[in-house]
């Protein structure tokens, strides 16, 4: 199977197979890396306004904007095709996903002009009919990452949830004495967090 790169939820670029995907405020661009020293642009798609993040997952690209999540099918990695759109309340919104759900944080108090602070769980099992399953109120959620068992969330520090039942997630831990922005879970045991003080690594084998 094609390899997908690992990146944070605030990333504006992502890797899949031999292609690089980048987003700016309006566009999704596809670059061939067959010659890694000289990437060549293969495709450009207008997505919408205020595009912020991109998260590759298997044969799909999840693009976050201030008003929603755009889902692209990249079965043909050189030519992604929009498959679904999920609209949400205005706010800054990184997005990650697993096999059945996308997880989106929305936070206000920034230049995104939002007032909501929540974690949305979006059912993506039946695309293109993505639908909101549940919203969890939060303080000011930012970056997030998921593994098979856990959801890691930058919100008033770092929160760790058991997500085995996404509609009834259980908070397992809350580390408050740090300012965090994004998180990357390499496994259910190894975590990297980006915050005011730089990069932090955690052993979360016992969350």
Regions found by a protein language model. Give the residues of each.
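Feature marking well-ordered beta-strand scaffolds used for ligand recognition
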Residues: 1-207
């Amino acid at each position: 199977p094609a390899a997908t790169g690992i990146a944070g939820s605030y990333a504006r670029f992502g890797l899949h197979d031999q292609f690089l995907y980048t987003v700016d405020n309006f566009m999704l661009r596809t670059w061939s890396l067959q010659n890694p020293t000289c990437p060549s642009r293969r495709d450009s798609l207008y997505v919408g306004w205020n595009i912020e993040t991109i998260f590759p997952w298997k044969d799909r690209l999840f693009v976050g904007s201030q008003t929603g999540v755009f889902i692209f099918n990249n079965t043909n990695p050189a030519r992604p095709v929009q498959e679904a759109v999920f609209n949400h309340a205005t706010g800054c919104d990184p997005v990650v996903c697993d096999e059945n759900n996308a997880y989106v944080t929305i936070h206000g108090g920034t230049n995104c002009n939002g007032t909501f602070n929540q974690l949305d769980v979006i059912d993506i099992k039946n695309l293109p009919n993505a639908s909101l399953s549940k919203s969890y109120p939060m303080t000011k959620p930012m970056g997030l990452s998921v593994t098979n068992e856990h959801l890691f969330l930058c919100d008033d520090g770092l929160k760790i949830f058991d997500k085995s039942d996404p509609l009834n997630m259980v908070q397992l831990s809350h580390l408050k004495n740090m300012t965090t922005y994004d998180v990357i879970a390499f496994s259910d045991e190894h975590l990297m967090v980006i915050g005011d003080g730089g990069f932090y690594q955690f052993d979360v084998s016992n969350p």
